Amino acid sequence: MKRRSVCVGDTVYVLAGNDKGKQGKVLRCLKDKVVVEGINVRVKNIKRSQENPKGKRINIEAPLHISNVRLSIDNQPARLFVKVREKGRELWNKHSDGSSSLYRSVRERKG
């Protein structure tokens, strides 16, 4: 499985779909999808029950595919590349002028 560059709590930029161009915070990471706060909101109908005699409608965030979001740095979508070191992986942000800067360092777990 390909490793993700997006983690819970990161701000991401939506590249495709109804919410294209919007930004939000990652709430959950699934296998190849992410749930973003306030993005891809769907309405779920709750049936009538003793707790809800009238029933109700709630809004939930549906997951987006990981390929439709990109990490947002300085309110712009960022292109990241990975360098593998002895201690673990490093995610680097590539700038438009050709330079790059370290964004995050991830230590590999054994086991």
Swiss-Prot record:
Assigned keywords, A-Z: Ribonucleoprotein, Ribosomal protein, RNA-binding, rRNA-binding
Record function comment: One of two assembly initiator proteins, it binds directly to the 5'-end of the 23S rRNA, where it nucleates assembly of the 50S subunit. One of the proteins that surrounds the polypeptide exit tunnel on the outside of the subunit.
Coiled-coil parts of chain: none
InterPro entries xref list: KOW, Rib_uL2_dom2, Ribosomal_uL24, Ribosomal_uL24_CS, Ribosomal_uL24_KOW, Translation_prot_SH3-like_sf
Subunit structure: Part of the 50S ribosomal subunit.
Family the UniProt entry places it in: Belongs to the universal ribosomal protein uL24 family.
Keyword Membrane in record: no
GO terms, molecular function: rRNA binding; structural constituent of ribosome
A GO CC term attached to the entry: ribosome
Protein name: Large ribosomal subunit protein uL24
Pfam family, one: ribosomal_L24
NCBIfam families assigned: rplX_bact (TIGR01079)
Signal sequence bounds: none
Gene Ontology biological process: translation
